[in-house]
Amino acid sequence: MSTLAPAELVERIWERDPSVWTGHDEAQWLGWLDEPARMRERVDELVEFVSGIDVDDVVLLGMGGSSLAPEVMRRVFRAERFHVLDTTHPTAIRRLEESIDVERTLFIAASKSGTTLETRSQTDYFRDKGGRFAVITDPGSPLAELSKDVFYGEPTIGGRYSALSVFGILPAVSMGIDVVRLLDRAEEMREGCRLEVGNPGLDLGRRLAETTLLRVAGDFGLWIEQLVAESTGKGGNGIVPVWRGGDPADVRLPDPYELGQEFFRWEFATAVAGSLLGINPFDQPDVHAAKDKTNALLSSRGRVPGTELGPEGSLDELLAAATPEDYVAILAFVDPAREPELEPFVRRAEATGAAVAVGLGPRYLHSTGQLHKGGPDTGLFVQVVDDFGDDLKIPGQAYGFKTLIACQALGDFETLRDRGRRIVRVQL
């Protein structure tokens, strides 16, 4: 845990000193500190590309850090013809496909590694339908081979810190957002986060480090949830974002363009909180466990996932064990359009007096999944599944989206159970 004076902590962060955190590879992941100015230099390139295409809709295919900032901007700026697909549920994919003219749509496949299972599956599906593609990825990624329109990210920026990089700014341009104005606001906050006194990022980070349960609300909460949970939830510790209960998150959005400031303020604050908590806020050591389990299930081609459901009594027993220090996480592998149907589970969880979080799968695997496995053992997990709808074939694979999401759900269930987490599985 850092014992540096606040002014020295700020100075050392800007000096890229990894000893501020754990002294390992943190200095390799600080490209976000300078990204607002770098992106200003790329604006003309991005605007020229978007203005040169004639489409009716834009669909972003991505997960986690590659999709959540665009999703927040889509909601805040009310970009009706911009869509984010961050699910593998076949019903949701089919509904999106039926709502657009694929040949009049630009698909943006976004993945830093280029190997994200969900993004590659979605990309293969819509490329087979004849859609036009652009790619956002890091240098050396296999995804770059799929399009002539490739926009490379900065390799020294992790996914959850990439809101103000090309992963956020190209989608913003395609929504018609004035990205110069957005980046100018971010640059103003960047300068504010250099101050020794009255530093907005430092002040927020110090408060975060003293927070156990952080209530995230509204559209911006989706992005905060990933940033905070994945950055701090490790080594048995972490700040737990919740929907009901907890201390309210400090979010300032008097107008939509304040998103530029807030993205940077929260990134800097999370880095500060990581230092004060004595953790590396830029790694995610437990994320791959559920991915590995999913891949093993897909490879086995044995049992059909989705049949191992707990009796109703199991849910009652789980919730009866909740204490005010715990949180209940509703982990729902369901069609996102059915999210309102989760409310009865939320109300039952609230009745225990514990804080409540809700995550849609597989989105949450790239968001709060790290916290669930590596964070404090105060979570009670209720995995909710539906019947996954009618299947859609994934080109080049022996399985379709129905099997994929079923394996993702079962893979996460088994990973949490194997780690001794308290979890039950119920049908919606």
Question: Could you tell me what each predicted segment is?
Answer:
Residues 51-194, 246-258:
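Glycine-rich phosphate-binding loops that contact phosphosugars or nucleotide phosphates
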Residues 80, 129-132, 149, 231-240, ...:
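Structural alpha-beta junctions
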